[in-house]
């Protein structure tokens, strides 16, 4: 069966109403030794959005992850029981804990932490032992997100990545180290070890490529092309001065040209290593041809089975492999006579209690952390409740941050970015400096205090809402809604741009368009000086000593009855 015929059969299956999401996803409990059957002769492992988490962590999946229009009630916009039902996963087990927020505290206490590079390294070695020639790909957001990554300027993650055996990577938050530092790492550390690919990053003046667009690797005699797609909106979502002179973008036409080029040069398998975000990748897969798979990241979505997206040339698999080192995707292709005959995919949760740490990686991590032990372990406070970040509108750790900003900067209102990275703490856990830095470790940490009119406040909220809920995925930037403290509002995600935010109140009184309010914030994309967010939050936490159960304030969500991306 040739590739075109294989695609036709898949299309017929779709037309017949075949429920593709539930196919091939076996309960993880049946294979807790990670001994998954091998298929074919081309093997790709995929991780993404690790955010510099070298140690095992807790990470709660979202309770609110809204999909609208064509994304409504389909992956990745399924949460809780809806996700379990869609993929045929049983409640109460390891799979349910890994992929959903359900019974999170009890399940986390039962199954323990996830991820950690020493445990991940053991899993990678096991997969490679059963899959000769397997490649390890990283989708970006690898060098940022922890205290040690910030304090070492990313060097800790570069060294750990080489030890782990990453073959190819692309980027996003890597660029917030600054273009000079990125190029220094490529030249001094990655050269000859890790291919950094990004087809969509060009020189502003002349259009020359900044990075290699792709790499071709031969796996068991099969030429495999891996094209890189860095985050398209880096100079908008992050400080543009950090990548001065570089242009980004989705660049759909240029991607199609590159696919055609590598196909003409003999590539039998072509994949896109993407940091677009899931919805953007799904649209892209429907519009370009010749891609066998998009291995995606940025939106931190743990999708148990690839979406099979039809296009004019056949079908493209679209995956997204979660975040924080919590998952490892394994994609197998059976390639014969230059054609893909079959494929299989598993998204494996990395349970630290099931994977003994790799001694060499453990030794490296201990060496990395040793100079900073006292700072990392400094106890700032104790939390009585669950502290987490992920969710479209707020998380309890973000609520803690905006509360700290209001108190410490004497503000009326506080705004905090809708970052999707940031780990979870269980009730009773100490909040250490390391835990705090896992929420705020960025290279532009200044806090700000600004006077804003009510009209300006609404504009800011509307602008961020459009980045998330724009009906066209190509205009979405993939984060969550800006977190707010002190301010209450309602949101209608299906409304037109500029008309989604309503009912803004402060202390029970309507926010007035012409009245001025003191608004605290942090992470300005312009070059602004201010006290670092971690210093502000650390001081506040020390003054509180004990953080009582945090109620993460949520807006009133209108017009989304029956949306499976919202769980009560």
Where on the chain are the PLM-derived regions?
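Residue-level signal for pocket-adjacent positions within structured domains
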Residues: 212, 241-243, 313, 345-346, ...
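Short, solvent-exposed loop/turn motifs
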Residues: 223, 386-387, 488, 510
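Short coil/turn linker and secondary-structure boundary residues
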Residues: 1, 115, 246, 356, ...
């Amino acid at each position: 069966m040739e590739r075109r015929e294989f695609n036709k059969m898949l299309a017929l299956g779709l037309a017949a109403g075949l429920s593709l999401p539930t196919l091939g996803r076996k309960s993880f409990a049946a294979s807790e030794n990670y001994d998954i059957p091998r298929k074919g002769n081309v093997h790709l492992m995929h991780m993404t959005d690790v955010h510099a988490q070298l140690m095992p962590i807790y990470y709660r999946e979202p309770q609110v992850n809204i999909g609208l229009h064509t994304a409504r009630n389909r992956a990745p916009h399924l949460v809780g029981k809806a996700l379990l039902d869609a993929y045929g996963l049983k409640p109460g087990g390891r799979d349910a804990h890994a992929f959903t927020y359900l019974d999170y505290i009890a399940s986390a206490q039962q199954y323990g932490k996830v991820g950690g590079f020493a445990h991940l390294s053991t899993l990678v070695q096991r997969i490679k032992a059963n899959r000769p020639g397997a490649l390890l790909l990283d989708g970006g957001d690898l060098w940022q997100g922890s205290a040690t990554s910030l304090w070492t300027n990313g060097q800790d993650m570069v060294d750990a990545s080489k030890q782990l055996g990453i073959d190819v990577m692309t980027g996003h938050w890597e660029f917030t180290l600054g273009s000079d530092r990125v190029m220094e790492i490529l030249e001094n550390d990655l050269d000859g070890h890790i291919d950094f690919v990004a087809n969509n990053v060009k020189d502003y003046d002349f259009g020359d490529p900044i990075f290699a667009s792709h790499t071709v690797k031969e796996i068991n005699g099969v030429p495999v092309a891996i094209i890189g797609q860095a985050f398209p909106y880096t100079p908008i979502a992050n400080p543009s001065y950090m990548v001065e002179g570089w242009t980004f973008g989705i660049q759909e036409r240029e991607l199609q040209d590159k696919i055609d080029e590598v196909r003409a040069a003999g590539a039998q398998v072509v994949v896109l290593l993407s940091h677009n975000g899931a919805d953007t990748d799904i649209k892209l897969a429907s519009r370009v041809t010749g891609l066998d798979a998009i291995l995606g990241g940025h939106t931190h979505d743990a999708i148990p089975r690839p979406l099979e997206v039809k296009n004019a040339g056949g079908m493209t698999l679209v995956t997204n492999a979660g975040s924080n080192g919590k998952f490892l995707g394994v994609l197998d292709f059976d390639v014969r006579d230059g054609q893909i005959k079959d494929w299989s995919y598993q998204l494996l949760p990395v349970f630290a209690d099931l994977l003994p740490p790799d001694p060499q990686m453990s030794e490296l991590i201990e060496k990395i952390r040793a100079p900073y032990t006292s700072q990392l372990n400094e106890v700032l406070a104790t939390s009585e409740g669950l502290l987490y970040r992920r969710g479209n509108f707020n998380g309890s750790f973000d609520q803690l941050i905006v509360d700290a900003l209001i108190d410490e900067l004497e503000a009326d209102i506080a705004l905090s970015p809708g970052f999707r990275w940031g780990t979870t703490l269980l009730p009773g856990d100490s909040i250490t400096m390391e835990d705090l830095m896992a929420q705020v470790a960025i290279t532009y940490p200044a806090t700000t205090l600004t006077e804003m009119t009510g009209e300006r406040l609404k504009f800011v909220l509307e602008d961020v809402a459009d980045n998330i809920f724009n009906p066209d995925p190509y205009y979405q930037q993939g984060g969550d809604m800006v977190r707010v403290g002190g301010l209450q509002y309602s949101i209608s995600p299906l409304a037109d741009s500029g008309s989604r935010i309503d009912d803004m109140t402060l202390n029970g009184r309507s926010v007035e368009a012409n009245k001025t309010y003191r608004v605290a914030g942090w992470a300005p994309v312009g070059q602004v000086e201010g006290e670092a967010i971690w210093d502000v939050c650390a001081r506040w936490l020390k003054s509180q000593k004990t953080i009582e159960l945090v109620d993460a304030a949520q807006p009133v969500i209108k017009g989304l009855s029956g949306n499976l991306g919202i769980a009560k």
